Each structure stands twice: as C-alpha cells, then as structure tokens.
Amino acid sequence: FFDDKIFNLMDFDCDQKDSVHFFYTLPFSKTKALIETTWISDLNDNSLKDYDKQLKNYIESKLKIKNYKINFKETGAIPLFHPKNIKKLNQMEIGTAGNMTRLSTGYTFLNIQEQSRYIRENIESITKTKIFSLDKKYQFLDNIFLKVLKNNPKKMAQIFYKMFNCPSNTVINFLSNKSSIYEDISIISKMPKWIFLKQLF
C-alpha cells in the first residue's frame, strides 16, 4: 500500500471548490497510514464538510486502494486568527488559546512545547513574567500570508509548491520558527513578488 519512508505533506491534486484543499498521507508502516483531508476555508461553507466521501474518493481513486479499513476517525478545526490574550492573575492561556498556532500553517505542537518549557522555567514568578509569544517576525509574515490566502485562494497550491522547493532544512526551520534571516530570504525569494507586495499596503 504505502512506502513507509515517504510521506505526502500537501497533495493539492483534488477538488479545490474555490478554496484551498489538500491531503496528507503519513505512513506508519507499509499497511497503515494517517490520511487527512484539510481545508483552509470559511467554516460556514457546509459544502466542504463531506469529509468521509472526500477520503473515500482519495483512497480509492488517487491511492488506488480498494480493500481497506478505517480504524479511527477524528475531526478538528484550527482558527486562523489569534484570540486576544489578556494576562490574568495566576492564569496563563496555553496552546491555541495562548496564540501558539502559526497562522500560515496551523502548526502548533512545537510552539506548545516551547511555551510549556518557558512556563516551567518561570513558574515561581509566573505572575510577574511576560506572556510567552511567537516571534514578531513570524507573526508579521503570517499576517501577510493570510491576506494573500484570502485574496488569491486559487494560487495557493503554486505558492506552497514554490516554498517546498526550497531546501528541506530551510523549510523545516521556517515552519518551526527557527529560521535565520538568510533562510527567510531564501523562502521569500521563491514567492510571487507582486502578490505579496500588494498585501503590504
């Protein structure tokens, strides 16, 4: 069924419905994998929510697997905005509520680990400690990205493709908030310039 040494991170070869749609295929072995259908879209659009049908079509038509069993299913939604984070006495928001989600990707897990480490190291003075936040550089870049996404949904597959054409370590560092200025420039230089520049104004 699967090549357990290769994962498919974003497969855009599927119906976009004037939005942004892709599949993940993450094999655990040659016979087991996590397959996910993902939409970046308006939650009010119920036409996008026939997830079971989407997965069935993808598994049978794209992956060419006819005899299979789904052992576990889950659904989720990641908000592509940061809630207002107000520090309260003896209380600190964590995870998505604590603005740990990268708005350009939805990635949160590594940021939660960094935030948890920060809280642990400052637990004795947590009421006097400033709120842990993502680097403002990434917040700025993500906000531009979201504007591009909103105004150019049909171009997003091409944009993601260009980004992932960068060296893998560069992409991983960028997505993990660890990129140097040179790595940032490397990724930005691959992007369609005019589309992004228009979002600055």
Where is each model-derived feature located?
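C-terminal helical "tail/cap" subdomain of flavin- and related membrane-associated enzymes
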Residues: R117-F201
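Short amphipathic alpha-helical segments, especially helix-boundary/capping motifs
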Residues: S29-A33, A77, N90-I94, F132-K137
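General secondary-structure edge motif
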Residues: K5, I35, N99, K136-N143
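FAD/FMN-dependent oxidoreductases across multiple families
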Residues: D15-S19, W39-Y118
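Low-complexity, flexible helical/coil segments
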Residues: F2-M10, N71-G76, G106-T108, T127-S133
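Internal, well-ordered alpha-helical segments in soluble enzyme and binding-protein domains
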Residues: I6-L9, H21, Y51, L55, ...
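Conserved FAD-binding catalytic core of PHBH/FMO-like flavoproteins
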Residues: F1-N46
